[in-house]
Amino acid sequence: MKFIIKLFPEIMIKSESVRKRFVKILTGNIRNVLNKYDDTVAVVKHWDYIEVRSKNIENRILLVELLGRIPGIHHFLEVEEKPFVTLHDIFEQTLSDVATQIENKTFCVRVKRKGKHDFSSLDAERYIGGGLNQAVASAKVQLSKPDVTVRIDIENDKMMLIKARHQGIGGYPIGTQEDVLSLISGGFDSGVSSYMLIRRGSRVHYCFFNLGGATHEIGVKQMAYHIWKRFSGSHKVRFVAINFEQVVAEILEKVDNGQMGVVLKRMMVRAASKVAQRFGIQAIVTGEALGQVSSQTLTNLRLIDEAAESLVLRPLITHDKEQIIAKAKEIGTEDIAKSMPEFCGVISKSPTVKAVKEKIEQEESYFDFSVLESAVQNAQYLDIRQIAEQTKKEVFEVDEITVLSANDVILDIRSPEEVDDKPLEISGQNIILMPFYKLSSHFAELDQSKNYVLYCERGVMSKLQALYLREKGFDNVKVLNKIS
């Protein structure tokens, strides 16, 4: 099984030294991601493409899915490589592969060629296309908008019949740009802004300001873990949790109501700047969009930036909410975001849209900054890969079982895509499909006389969700530890 990885076009127009560095980094990223799932994978870089091979044909769907999420890949071709001697050899091998595909359809042949041959690419297209047209009576050549395009790459003494073309996410390889710290709340905006910086080549770390207790933190961890695993699993990143409940309490007690929103955001960027400086991170990322809420006017954003000691990046600054939600749906964070409460917007009933610097500074003079310092000093730092281990400790009270009783119902909480790829089948067992992001709104609708055993592939999300449901008062939840 072989894939040809085509690079993001902006990589190709870089200087030779920069392009080589980017390709080297992308090659390493691909290897890091794929080797976790398939130890037979070999990744080889070339001047203008990267070659990926695997001996495990059963991993095809998984590898296609993983490659489609790695930043730096514009698209990739699934190819079948065969040796040839003459142009007629290429035709015969192509015929055996595509004859059934072009029956009763229009088709054309497109050839790309490298190396020395006694024929041109156009000669090959005409010869192979003419041969297919004669061999398959019901097929018809049509050069413009055919039903089937037969694509062949010829390189030296080998031909590669392109079985499929898959789109990548583009962007730059992670590690080609400097690290950033994303202020993630679990909502639509922060998840999308994190993804956009990942796609642009930065390693994105996550900073979460907890305003809503353990349940809120669990939800945000789910989103951060989802984004990391899906799009940046090639790199280690940090998840930083800062308890901001006392900071909010101090603001509510001492700051004028209309100024609370801006003051809270200023406290957040102050804290995030300290975290960024500690780890040598160059910028912090927020999901703010111009005019979306009262604190996001140009005047207010300028005042927020003045409190930061790091560069503040806002990749969504010109995006509409509709665009943001569409992107969240595309990257798989929409449903998680739907279940997240918005805390920042509710602390002020009459927020100012045009804050005055002198007024903000006066209100902040009433604030006890030792509260902020304490919050930063007591921040929790976690390797995002350790979320699984931390979850095991947090959900010790949730039963993990291997043997099911008559009253147990398996709740498969994987995403629909995961279920389609690898359906869960246990003879004689009742299985309900309910993606993890729907549990908060739909679990109560289930028959509560039953015990529900949560299942996911690696057990991380099932344990997080079990803890979440326990905190909501549902005691009839367990975790499926192993399928025998």
UniProtKB/Swiss-Prot annotation:
Enzyme class at the top of the EC tree: transferase
Residues holding ATP: 183-184, 265, 287, 296
Statement: the UniProt record of this protein carries the keyword Disulfide bond: yes
Keywords: ATP-binding, Cytoplasm, Disulfide bond, Nucleotide-binding, Redox-active center, RNA-binding, Thiamine biosynthesis, Transferase, tRNA-binding
EC number: 2.8.1.4
Domain THUMP as annotated: residue spans: 61-165
Subcellular location: Cytoplasm
Family as reported in the entry's similarity comment: Belongs to the ThiI family.
Protein name per UniProt: tRNA sulfurtransferase
Organism name: Histophilus somni (strain 129Pt) (Haemophilus somnus)
